[in-house]
């Protein structure tokens, strides 16, 4: 008899009756891995906190649900095929059951009205009345299968709607949203969510929004199943909108949450925006929000927390800390004028990434062309001097801007972030008739190609420096007020070291407003290298193009057997002083882009040792700069160069073969392979050059086979 009693005690352990949760918490709970780990998930921002990595069981717990009535989490131990519950200490207690199937496990479950529901595709919908546990935690509860429940939908989780009492889940294969009758198990197709995958965790909030977490990438999607959206639901319009992009990914996911709680606590630790809701500001609109990390903010004062966005005429500046205006950390030094650059000072509390949008067309959204003005720009702690380009078609008037600063990248103007701050402000824009003109077009690039063996032809492959090149000029009242030069380094097929610069012929450097001009390398602001001591404005993009690349090939992007991505881009924003320069006094595009010898390096036989800036190669018939050594290079009669300053002939042979080319075509030009003469790669080029450009003007459209680099 004693042996029998001991056997019964071992097979049915006594429940310690851990304390339930004190409240209906807003946090979502995510159960992952074996042995199970319990994570707290902020559904608003996507941040996660490990709450417990030892539940007292070396097992996986799945099919979890929160019981609002007794405030326990119930789940299914997939390792040992038994039911468990967890209180606020997250220690799992085994529940005594009868009728629990032993031929399969459960991964789908939730609790509603004190009944635990379990589901398995192909097996059915099961119920467990939990009320016996109210008076005796060691009571045995009965597992019942709902007769006739079809269980055909492939689910990995479902959740109860807090208002209508139905279960909802997404078919992993089709992305279809289904509702389930908890009494009969009947399945009703509602509509296509537009997303597929293993949705291992599902949660509702008190407003009727359904949140699902996808195991593969951790993204959290939200579906509007609120009563206010009844018309769309009835019509099957139930898209799953990406709500958080950085949730926790796992092969074993299940979630539980008190569906009667809002997703934002009254003691919120989240910053929201302030613009009108047409810009997607409120949480219901998936507006921008940042979990306050105590480290990352704009301005001098940390932001305060909000329960939701403050939509105009309300404003966050009237509640708590004025972190949107006086302390917002955003200062426009120059006005926002259409087509021009505006200097803006951004004060950051620490390093991080800035993205920003301005509604140029004033249509109440930030999704227009050119409305994202900064993308993942890396800020330093303290003041950062930046420039943004005002869209040429921006409308005059007051509009909205949104700045987001975070430790995350790839943020949009909506959605959650686990760190930082969002600042929405109104800005004034002026458009007083500025117009733009382009070279070669608004979106295309010309190709610059250089041979650096001048004054010798050598291999004449015209790929020692290849750059893509574009210019945008802004004009007002018959004057050029701004020029922007964009470029990309496409190839370096040189053994010699070369720099690259652009001269604006006849433009006195004093006419450049240096404080309002800038240079970027790979999207990052760097020093504006306007050469000192010159009579004309010369901007040095790079003293050594080779330093701008890292290649595993013999040369960079000149062999089809060794292809690499582009690595270096640049932009020069040149603002002219005063009212600008009259178009009659302004030089024609494409200006004068040229290469020069990198200072301190050898550049070929019979040349001065380490010629540096005294050696240049320009486009044909373009005179060199004042830095060029005319005496030792032109007048010495070196190589095959036939330059003659008295006749205006520069950088061409006696047959008119140049050492530099600029090609404008609908498609970006493909330059010759390494050691392939351009005449071999493009046979019609010879007659084009020797005719002075009169014949074969489309020579670049007729390449020989297998003789050019094909990106």
What do these predicted regions represent?
Residues 43-46, 86-90, 129-134, 181-185, ...:
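Short loop/turn segments that connect beta-strands within beta-propeller blades
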Residues 535-711:
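A eukaryote-biased signal for long
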Residues 262-463:
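A broad "non-catalytic interaction surface" signal
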Residues 19-20, 58-66, 100-113, 150-159, ...:
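Repeated scaffold domains used in trafficking and secretory/extracellular systems
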Residues 19-49, 272:
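An edge-strand/N-cap motif at the start of beta-rich repeat modules
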Residues 47-55, 90-99, 137-149, 186-193, ...:
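A short beta-strand motif characteristic of beta-propeller blades
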